[in-house]
Amino acid sequence: DLLYRRGGAYERIGNFEMADKDLLDSLKINKDDAYVLNYLAYSWLERDYKIQEAIEMLEIAYSSKSNDPYIIDSIGWAYYLVNDYIKAEMYLKRAVELMPDDPIVNDHYGDILWKLGRKIQARYFWRSVSKMEDVDQELLQKINLKMIKGL
């Protein structure tokens, strides 16, 4: 819908106040829209904002779209941010299975593995990102640093 697309556009240019307004207004129309819930929740996770509320939104999104790899990645990352590494690993392992060529998903999974003490496996997933094509330079720099120093 229009509010979802406009909210996404605002979010991409960094106007988070307007993005949140449009995305929340979109949820007033359809409170269970999994894609709007995921977009808004992930945006909040990226800003370290309303983490618990974002997790609740992602659980709703996941309940209706349990095979959507983006939603699975988001909920896994949310659990990572609250240090629930066991739950996070369960979701992110599935996200990697569904999107093995996605750099963000592989990066997230590597981070989880590192936190679980599986450092060789973590470096394997980070290294796979460094070999992918068209990876954002900023992400590549972070990956290269992780491969050297870890987390």
What is the predicted role of each segment?
Residues 5, 39-40, 74, 108, ...:
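Canonical tetratricopeptide repeat
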Residues 8, 42-43, 77, 111:
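Residue-level recognition of tetratricopeptide repeat
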Residues 12, 46-47, 81, 115, ...:
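Register position in tetratricopeptide repeats
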Residues 29, 64, 97-98, 131-133:
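Structural marker of alpha-solenoid helical repeat scaffolds
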Residues 103, 107-108, 115-151:
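Terminal, low-structured helical/coil segments at or just beyond the last alpha-helical repeat
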